[in-house]
Regions:
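Contiguous beta-strand/loop segments that form the cofactor/metal-binding neighborhood of enzyme cores
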Residues: 1, 177, 183-268, 302-314, ...
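N-terminal Rossmann-like dinucleotide-binding module
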Residues: 1-49
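C-terminal helix-rich "cap/oligomerization" subdomain common to oxidoreductases
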Residues: 1-3, 9, 69-72, 271, ...
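Active-site loop of classical SDR/Rossmann-like NAD(P)-dependent oxidoreductases
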Residues: 15, 37, 294-305
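Hydrophobic residues in well-ordered beta-strands that form the structural core
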Residues: 16, 55, 97-98, 123-125, ...
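Beta-loop-alpha module in the N-terminal Rossmann-like domain of NAD(P)-dependent dehydrogenases
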Residues: 49, 53-115
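Rossmann-fold dehydrogenase core element
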Residues: 109-129, 147-155
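Predominantly a Rossmann-like dinucleotide-binding segment in NAD(P)-dependent oxidoreductases
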Residues: 129-218, 342
């Protein structure tokens, strides 16, 4: 894979400075320049990671920056404008790696996808949970057929995210920021569901106004498979003085085998690898437990950028393409609509109506 594409980074917050740029350095990718809403923060990141050029503003970098790939890590409401400006102003632009959510509504996301197509710029969306090591190995097991026909897949999250200040005022809190990871993972594992049932309640710890805190949802598939997640961002009064029981567990049950695992990120900044175990009907009760040293944050971010670089080099669609991500955004919309109407929602109908 060609690694010397020049990557221009926009943003200097946690995801960019602690996850994406360190991952790129470890993989040998070339970051050529950076800009942020705060030049001082951009300069600090550049100094820490030996990035040669810092621009005074995002607009200056978009117009004059020497980069082939644009890597964006900004709050979701700021992202669409940056993408549109990049398409208009950047001279050499060949690919964009956008943050999830691509946009906070399906129509805006569709417009961004179409605008990139019109400019022949490859768009990928940073759905990085797909590149968590246990999630990736689980997909390999599914592809191999070792688990048989899938009956049930579940994710149980009891973890406390650190909501950023920019989350206040968004139309969605948990669904478009946290649950989007699990919804996209179910799509990655099992494909697109036909119906969604959801219920949500507010997170008592979050003081600003919001509608979706603790999310519960069930996905129905025509194959008969079911998927469900409990996205519990409250996780008990662990921050208020009680003991804590923090974890994310997942499980996939098939007719020929099952797999289960844990996700390590709730222990961040301690680097705890995710885990996976699997067993099949031919194993006489034995469980297989592969191990690795890599962790979701930051190592999974190598995978998302590599997807884009490979797609640009070969002239193909990345697995995490803008078109694919529209289906994840539709699933997020379906969760919110179902929770508010107390009715099942078909995500495909939302794609067709927008």
């Amino acid at each position: 894979m060609k690694k010397d594409f020049k990557i221009g980074c926009i943003g200097s917050g946690f995801i960019m400075k602690d996850c994406q740029i360190p991952a790129y350095k470890s993989a040998g990718f070339h970051v050529s320049c950076i800009a942020s809403r705060s030049k001082d923060k951009a300069k600090e990141v550049a100094l820490n990671h030996n990035i040669p050029v810092v621009y005074d503003s995002i607009d200056e970098m978009l117009e004059h920056g020497d980069f082939d790939i644009l890597d964006i890590a900004v709050p979701p409401e700021a992202q669409p404008e940056i993408i549109m400006k990049a398409l208009e102003q950047s001279k050499k632009l060949r690919g964009i790696l956008a943050q999830k959510p691509l946009a906070m509504d399906l129509l805006t996301a569709k417009n961004l996808v179409n605008a990139c197509k019109q400019k022949s710029v490859t768009l990928a969306v940073n759905q990085n949970m797909r590149f968590d090591q246990s999630v990736r190995v689980a997909k390999s097991l599914l592809n191999s057929g070792k688990l048989g026909d899938i009956v049930l897949a579940t994710i149980e999250m009891r973890a406390i995210p650190h909501w950023m200040p920019w989350a206040q005022g968004l139309k969605s809190l948990s669904t478009f920021i946290m649950s989007i990871h699990h919804l996209d993972t179910f799509r990655y594992w099992l494909g697109n569901p036909n119906l969604v049932f959801a219920s949500t309640t507010k997170d008592p710890r979050t003081k600003f106004s919001h509608t979706d805190g603790v999310n519960l949802y069930i996905l129905e598939y025509d194959s008969g498979a079911r998927a469900s997640s409990w996205d519990d961002v409250w996780a008990g009064p662990a921050k208020e003085g009680a003991g804590e029981d923090i974890y994310i567990r997942w499980r996939i049950e098939g007719t020929l085998g099952m797999a289960k695992g844990t996700i390590g990120w709730p222990k961040y900044p301690e680097k705890i690898p995710s885990t996976l175990e699997f067993t099949t009907v031919g194993d006489n009760g034995k469980w297989h437990s592969p191990v690795w040293n890599e962790v979701w944050f930051p190592d999974a971010f190598v995978g998302t950028m590599a997807q884009l670089l490979r797609a640009v080099e070969l002239g193909i669609e990345p697995e995490i393409s803008g078109d694919d991500n529209l289906l994840t955004i539709a699933l997020c919309e379906a969760v919110m609509i179902s929770a508010s109407t107390h009715q099942a929602v078909n995500p495909s109908s939302l794609i067709e109506s927008n």
